């Protein structure tokens, strides 16, 4: 896909993105795709922080961000968008300023709220790829359903302790959805929060970086191996595993007759 530098990129952009465009799979045509693309990130925590920074740095033209929380002291161990001076400020405001400072060519649209069934379609409208960097199953299930029904590719990541997981749910008759893997919502007691079980910040960041990689590939029109697989990361053992995901005929979201 590599091509000569394009006249519609400024001299500053030409230098900024030169390392991207040297990649055969990107080139200036791919860089132009990224600049014209629209990516939504749900959750500006440990995973979302890393994903947002690398998407902005790569040159994604429009980033959406949903988060209704303020910056807390305990966030700073892993949520690298924020600094000590940001304590008490709303995350989306801090994130917008940080991302714009990193790349002024990137437009950031923020939603200082939590997703719910009443607002999810409006918030996601117009975005080509959605990254689920949330930390709770109600939001994950809501995104899984809305993205699948509206035909939006979903890149979902989670992290706890030393461990992380990543998958891509690409709507299509032959592909499994998120709920083929997690058909029913786990109870709150079965899934402890990071405040209960702990989390290594670098693991959350690793999963956010991998999320950004998958999103950037999708925007180039490249197929992801994770549409039918789950990538599991064990930071303690220093090991990745790629596990098969199967489309379930009885899936409550994408099964037969759905």
Pin down the residues of each PLM region.
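Adenine nucleotide-associated cytosolic modules
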Residues: 1-258
């Amino acid at each position: 896909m590599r091509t000569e530098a394009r006249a519609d990129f400024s001299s500053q952009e030409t230098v900024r993105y030169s390392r991207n465009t040297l990649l055969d799979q990107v080139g200036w045509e791919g860089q132009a795709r990224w600049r014209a693309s629209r990516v939504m990130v749900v959750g500006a925590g440990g995973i979302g922080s890393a994903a947002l920074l690398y998407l902005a740095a790569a040159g994604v033209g429009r980033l959406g961000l949903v988060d209704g929380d303020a910056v807390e002291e305990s966030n700073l161990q892993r949520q690298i968008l924020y600094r000590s001076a940001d304590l008490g400020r709303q995350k989306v405001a801090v994130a917008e300023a940080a991302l714009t400072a990193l790349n002024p060519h990137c437009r950031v649209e923020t939603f200082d709220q939590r997703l719910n069934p009443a607002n999810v379609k409006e918030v996601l409208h117009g975005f080509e790829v959605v990254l689920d960097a949330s930390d709770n199953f109600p939001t994950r299930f809501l995104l899984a359903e809305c993205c699948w029904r509206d035909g939006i590719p979903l890149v979902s990541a989670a992290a706890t302790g030393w461990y992380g997981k990543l998958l891509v749910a690409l709507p299509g008759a032959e592909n499994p959805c998120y709920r083929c893997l997690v058909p029913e919502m786990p109870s709150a007691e079965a899934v402890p929060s990071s405040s209960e079980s702990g989390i290594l910040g670098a693991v959350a960041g690793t999963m956010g970086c991998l999320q950004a990689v998958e999103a950037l590939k999708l925007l180039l029109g490249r197929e992801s191996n994770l549409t039918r697989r789950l990538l599991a990361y064990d930071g303690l053992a220093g090991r990745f595993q790629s596990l098969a995901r199967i489309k379930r005929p009885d899936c409550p979201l994408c099964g037969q007759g759905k």
